């Protein structure tokens, strides 16, 4: 695996070194009180930079009208499946990375990370999942415990890839549309908390749709901000769905992000009908972008497989 970061500016290289230091500090703290044998033996086997900062083409324009900048995308590989638990081992790292970016200003680039075992990554490669194949092809190792390589990818045949993409599209998009209908009904009934939850679920499923169709992988999370970051790496049309230049726009998205838990369980959660309608328009725009991107991807796979039946209208 590549280890060279010479294509990055010196300040980005220094920043990645700082991020790596933070990862190890927080991971060691998370293991410090462990008494079980497996926890004492816990370690990080690899930290891999992937995405735009690995392959080139990153965007760093936080002060423009779009207000978009690429994240450092990191795959952290650990030696035990139990160490992938977000709440137990990685929540404090997430909080610290956000704090050092937004408050302490010791970081200037957002950091986005996922955690898997080597077996999970190699299984993804063995099943021809594009996400893991791209990581193996373009990724840059920032840390390796040993020189144990990732397995050689086994790409799916064109027919297999097409069948899987269609299956994901036909399963996940209707689910997103169903929750969007539920959101509209709930707004009409004046049940704004249910409307917020249903709209969150619609957006979440749209992101799962585009990630699964295009990469055959999606993180098993409900964090809308995290999913948005993952998906927006695929196509800039997904960025356009969410205005984010005004603080008010960003605050509305945060309310939607919180709705997965708070709209169901917190008596203090508040959202207005105007906010919901604005967010609903954004999710509709997101849905149009997802449908277009997935349709194009499936058409591309059909061409490779020598097939060309049209997608059913949605």
Model-derived regions, located:
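Metal-dependent nucleotidyltransferase catalytic core
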Residues: 2-35, 41, 60-125
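Terminal alpha-helical segments
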Residues: 7, 84-91, 105-107, 111-117, ...
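Short gly/ser-rich loop at a beta-strand->alpha-helix junction or flexible surface loop bordering the NTP-binding
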Residues: 44-58
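Flexible, active-site-proximal loop/turn residues at the rims of small-molecule/cofactor binding pockets
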Residues: 53, 81, 269
């Amino acid at each position: 695996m590549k280890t060279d970061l010479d294509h990055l500016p010196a300040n980005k290289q220094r920043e990645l070194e700082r991020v790596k230091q933070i990862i190890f500090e927080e991971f060691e703290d998370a293991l410090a009180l462990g008494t079980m044998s497996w926890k004492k033996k816990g370690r990080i086997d690899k930290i891999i930079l992937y995405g735009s900062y690995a392959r080139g083409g990153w965007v760093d324009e936080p002060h423009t009208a779009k207000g978009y900048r690429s994240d450092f995308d990191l795959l952290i590989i650990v030696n035990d499946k139990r160490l992938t638990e977000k709440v137990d081992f990685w929540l404090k790292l997430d909080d610290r990375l956000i704090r050092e970016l937004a408050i302490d200003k010791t970081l200037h680039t957002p950091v986005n990370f996922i955690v898997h075992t080597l077996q999970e990554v190699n299984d993804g490669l063995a099943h021809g999942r594009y996400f893991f194949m791209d990581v193996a092809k373009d990724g840059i190792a920032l840390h390796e415990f040993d020189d144990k390589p990732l397995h050689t990818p086994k790409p799916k045949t064109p027919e297999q890839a097409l069948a899987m993409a269609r299956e994901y599209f036909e399963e996940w998009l209707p689910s997103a549309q169903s929750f969007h209908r539920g959101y509209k009904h709930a707004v009409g009934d004046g049940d704004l908390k249910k409307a917020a939850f249903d709209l969150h679920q619609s957006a979440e499923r749209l992101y799962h749709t585009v990630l699964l169709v295009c990469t055959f992988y999606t993180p098993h999370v409900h964090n809308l901000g995290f999913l948005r970051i993952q998906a927006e790496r695929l196509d800039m049309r997904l960025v356009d769905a969410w205005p984010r230049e005004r603080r008010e726009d960003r605050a509305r998205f945060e309310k939607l992000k919180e709705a997965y838990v708070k709209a169901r369980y917190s008596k203090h959660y508040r959202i207005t009908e105007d906010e919901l309608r604005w967010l609903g328009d954004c999710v509709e725009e997101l849905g149009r972008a997802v449908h277009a991107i997935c349709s194009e991807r499936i058409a591309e796979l059909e061409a490779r497989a020598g097939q060309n039946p049209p997608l059913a209208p949605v």
